[in-house]
Amino acid sequence: MEQDTQHVKPLQTKTDIHAVLASNGRIIYISANSKLHLGYLQGEMIGSFLKTFLHEEDQFLVESYFYNEHHLMPCTFRFIKKDHTIVWVEAAVEIVTTRAERTEREIILKMKVLEEETGHQSLNCEKHEIEPASPESTTYITDDYERLVENLPSPLCISVKGKIVYVNSAMLSMLGAKSKDAIIGKSSYEFIEEEYHDIVKNRIIRMQKGMEVGMIEQTWKRLDGTPVHLEVKASPTVYKNQQAELLLLIDISSRKKFQTILQKSRERYQLLIQNSIDTIAVIHNGKWVFMNESGISLFEAATYEDLIGKNIYDQLHPCDHEDVKERIQNIAEQKTESEIVKQSWFTFQNRVIYTEMVCIPTTFFGEAAVQVILRDISERKQTEELMLKSEKLSIAGQLAAGIAHEIRNPLTAIKGFLQLMKPTMEGNEHYFDIVFSELSRIELILSELLMLAKPQQNAVKEYLNLKKLIGEVSALLETQANLNGIFIRTSYEKDSIYINGDQNQLKQVFINLIKNAVESMPDGGTVDIIITEDEHSVHVTVKDEGEGIPEKVLNRIGEPFLTTKEKGTGLGLMVTFNIIENHQGVIHVDSHPEKGTAFKISFPKK
């Protein structure tokens, strides 16, 4: 061996690190000595994927190693420490099932970190005697065996402390040599890329002691300098009465090229997935095992850990559990074809979102799973509801106009004849007054119906002082409110706040809102009217201390004939909403049981 006179620092085996991985490669446990040997605290590794800590060239090696359920040899790979340095790790794997029905697997990983010793050792037997291997742990190479392996189709070589002493014909072909003399007698380090030298030294020393070493991937160099990627399996042996190393090499250059192509394809696919505006996720055994960035935003999660590994049914209404479970199971078992269905979910902010969902069968670590694509249609659904509501308003308005005109004509005749009959009804004036007041109420309802049909009719918009307008409305209703123990309190940011609108229609709006607020407090209370403004809008809030509006009614506020009052017509708020809409304003309703209701109207300044 050409490096016999050079002192080297071989790698020594440290204490075992134990880890438990989920079937998808996510670390669910690692022993506390990870901080000492790898630089990471337990909490920094648990929840992460093992591959994020591996050298990129070893990721496929480890991944394929996990797929093999018969791990006869340990696997050696490079691990990236927290300080970004690289250490070699030798790992043994055991696959266990966590359920009797064998639906979930866990990977038990027993790792040894191979680090440099502080003392100097030499591979030269004359300067450093390595403890000989026991006869029981050693395979002897005899002349008969040598003739047997000569024509093996796989490259094979034998070295003594790194110095090549035998190669078969396949090894010659792989290294591009014409004769064995071009290889025998040379150090194996001459053919191995420098980045692997430290781990090779460690493996040689261990085999010199008769210890087994694991499988490893290495890059060797042919005689013409061309790199060749190899999978190396090694074991201790005895060759011509010397402790030696038996190497069986498999050319994986084609596999490496394929892995590179696959990795690039995977990266492009991941880039496409991560940047998709639709949510793309994978469900396995009822849990989220993958989700892209759009999904994290859709469910309003703070981090991936809020969703990954969690039960999907946590985001579903209990009524939907059975349907979704059956749909996912049928798709996973390919019993039904993929179709677009509508599905609602709960976000982490307890907000309901509406989605279109497509389920596609896929696999997750070789097991049946379902890929889910979710498209947020919450805004579309809201728009559809607004259009439906607008259509209802239009139909109700047309119906109201027809009814109002049909009733007004006979009503005018009835009132006229009652007026003529009044002088002849001495002693029955009380009944006359009741009938006449009810007819006046019918007239008021007819006026509201006509307002609903064409709220913009006869509208004369002008520059209005909002403080003055609300003051007039408050004065009109204040006397009746005080009789019921209700105080109307008004507050303004400024004395003069102006908007552009129709005075009569806006008075109708505030009369309806203040009157509703007063009627919601039969036991007395306070009605607050607050006027504020910002750069673009003027805001008017009418707030009461009543019992509040039930949640099931709150979402239907403004619908025709919807009322919570015993004598209400269900038209007042509908007219109010219509007038505000025709003034390019918006109205927001906030109500809490036993705490009251607030109607906030926002008008544009211009």
From Swiss-Prot:
Residues 3-73, 140-214, 265-335 form the PAS domain. Residues 402-606 form the Histidine kinase domain. The keyword Transferase applies. Its EC number is 2.7.13.3. It holds the Pfam family HisKA. Keywords: ATP-binding, Kinase, Nucleotide-binding, Phosphoprotein, Repeat, Sporulation, Transferase, Two-component regulatory system. Residues 77-116, 218-255 form the PAC domain. GO terms for molecular function: ATP binding; identical protein binding; phosphorelay sensor kinase activity. The modification Phosphohistidine is found at residue 405. It is an enzyme of class 2 (transferase). GO terms for biological process: regulation of DNA-templated transcription; sporulation resulting in formation of a cellular spore. It catalyses: ATP + protein L-histidine = ADP + protein N-phospho-L-histidine. Signal peptide: none annotated. It comes from the Bacteria. Phosphorylates the sporulation-regulatory proteins spo0A and spo0F. It also autophosphorylates in the presence of ATP. PANTHER family: SENSOR HISTIDINE KINASE (PTHR43065), SPORULATION KINASE A (PTHR43065:SF34). This is Sporulation kinase A. It comes from Bacillus subtilis (strain 168). The gene is kinA.
